[in-house]
């Protein structure tokens, strides 16, 4: 059966699945993280280690992608992964009151929960992106990548803002009810959105009778220079991107005495800024063909670094009214940087050896996950360490400065490996 490229409606349906992923994950990385640090007064390194563990589990992403390449059905991996993610998120929420009542019991439940979250995101997210790379017409891949990522950011922002509005006055019971509604709704919407797309597109191939061993397939992909260079770029840039993920809400709570609802809403506003940055680049670079994608990613990285320096100054001067606008600006520049990298990833996934789209997406997803875990844990650990030597505001500020330096380094790497021509499609130079 010949492949029928995805229609725009099908692309938006797949984007809805990405939206559901973001809606669940944001509860773990922002709301639950803040509750551990501020309400339960636990060290920031604890939620940092749990989130790093969930990212570490995602080192299995290449394996999930390879399985979906060879089993002939990506839909079941998408739905099954979303189910694991929903169950893990519910367990993570249940662990909050358990941590307060019995620390070790709560910690044990948290470890299992974050492990399920990592496996769910890896199985569902990798298979979803592989399906898109396989079934989307080449000319639509950059736009499809932008649409699905924007929908994920939209889901993150709307969930964070809405949860922030209904979470106050805070209670464990209210928090558990909110998480149950979000996770149950996300799983149901995913099943409805994905159903039938793979079969109608004609990409539900027969399973490979004698598939190559996973490690042999992974070595084939690593031998491709473009894939290898892009993996290194993803790791560095995502380390910078995720360093503030676990500390921004505690920063607002500890330095500016913001409530859980206020900091959750701030997180949603930041992701709203990411959304706007992605829209700008999508319209300017793809629609109007203004500037090269390399220029956009460099501008995003350097803008992020400058904004982090500004947030440090805001903290030292105690200018609370400027905090949320600065955080939105940081999100805006983050979005500029991210959308170009996503376009390049979608283009490269379909190049090279056939029936390896899932493995390539898994490789880059694993690099992103490792970097995210490393960056998040490093940010949290630095804050804990520096708070022993200086006041809280200065400790957060020093961490933000280091994150800004990594963004500058990522910009320099992008200049070396990305094509500087003004084009609507991202291209990575397969050399240095």
List where the protein language model places each region.
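Short amphipathic helix-loop junctions that connect adjacent transmembrane helices
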Residues: 30-45, 246-263, 384
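Glycine-rich segments within core transmembrane alpha-helices of 12-TM secondary carriers
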Residues: 57-58, 142-167, 364-378
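C-terminal transmembrane helical hairpin of 12-TM major facilitator-type secondary transporters
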Residues: 294-341
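A membrane-interface helix-boundary motif in multi-pass transporters
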Residues: 74-76, 106, 164-184, 292-295, ...
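C-terminal ends and interior cores of transmembrane alpha-helices
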Residues: 82-104, 302-318
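Cytoplasmic membrane-interface "Motif A"-like loop-to-helix N-cap segments
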Residues: 70-87, 103, 286-302
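Juxtamembrane intracellular "pre-TM" segments in multi-pass secondary transporters
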Residues: 1-8, 198-231, 255, 428-432
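Helix-to-loop junctions at the C-terminal end of transmembrane segments
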Residues: 59-73, 167, 277-293
């Amino acid at each position: 059966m010949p492949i029928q490229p995805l229609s725009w409606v099908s692309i938006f349906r797949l984007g809805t699945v990405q939206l559901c992923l973001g809606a669940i994950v944001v509860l773990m990385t922002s709301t639950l993280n803040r509750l551990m640090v501020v309400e339960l007064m636990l060290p920031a390194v604890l939620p940092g280690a749990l989130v790093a563990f969930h990212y570490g589990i995602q080192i299995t992403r290449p394996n999930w992608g390879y399985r979906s390449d060879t089993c002939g059905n990506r839909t079941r991996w998408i739905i099954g992964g979303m189910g694991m993610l929903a169950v893990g998120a519910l367990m993570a929420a249940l662990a909050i009151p358990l941590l307060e009542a019995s620390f070790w019991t709560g910690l044990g439940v948290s470890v299992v929960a974050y492990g399920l979250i990592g496996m769910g995101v890896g199985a569902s997210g990798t298979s979803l992106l592989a399906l898109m790379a396989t079934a989307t017409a080449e000319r639509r891949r950059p736009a499809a990548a932008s649409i699905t990522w924007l929908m994920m950011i939209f889901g993150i922002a709307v969930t964070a803002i809405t949860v922030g509005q209904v979470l106050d006055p805070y209670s464990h019971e209210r928090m558990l009810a909110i998480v149950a509604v979000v996770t149950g709704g996300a799983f149901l919407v995913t099943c409805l959105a994905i159903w039938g797309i793979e079969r109608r597109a004609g990409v539900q191939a027969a399973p490979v009778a004698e598939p190559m061993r996973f490690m042999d397939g992974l070595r084939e992909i690593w031998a491709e220079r473009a894939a290898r260079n892009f993996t290194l770029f993803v790791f560095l840039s995502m380390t910078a991107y995720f360093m503030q993920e676990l500390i921004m809400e505690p920063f607002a709570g500890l330095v500016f005495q913001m409530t859980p609802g206020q900091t959750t809403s701030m997180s949603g506003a930041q992701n709203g800024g990411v959304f706007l940055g992605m829209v700008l680049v999508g319209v300017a670079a793809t629609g109007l063909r203004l500037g090269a994608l390399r220029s956009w990613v460099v501008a995003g990285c350097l803008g992020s670094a400058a904004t982090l320096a500004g947030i440090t100054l805001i903290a030292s001067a105690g200018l609370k009214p400027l905090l949320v606008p600065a955080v939105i600006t940081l999100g805006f520049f983050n979005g500029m940087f991210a959308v170009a990298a996503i376009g390049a990833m979608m283009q490269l996934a379909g190049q090279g050896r056939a029936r390896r789209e899932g493995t390539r997406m898994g490789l880059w997803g694993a690099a992103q996950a490792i970097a995210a875990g490393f960056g998040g844990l490093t940010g949290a650990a630095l804050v804990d360490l520096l708070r022993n030597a200086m006041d809280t505001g200065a400790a957060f500020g020093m961490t933000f400065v280091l994150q800004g330096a990594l963004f500058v380094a990522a910009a320099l790497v992008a200049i070396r490996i990305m094509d500087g021509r003004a084009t609507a499609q991202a291209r990575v130079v397969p050399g240095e």
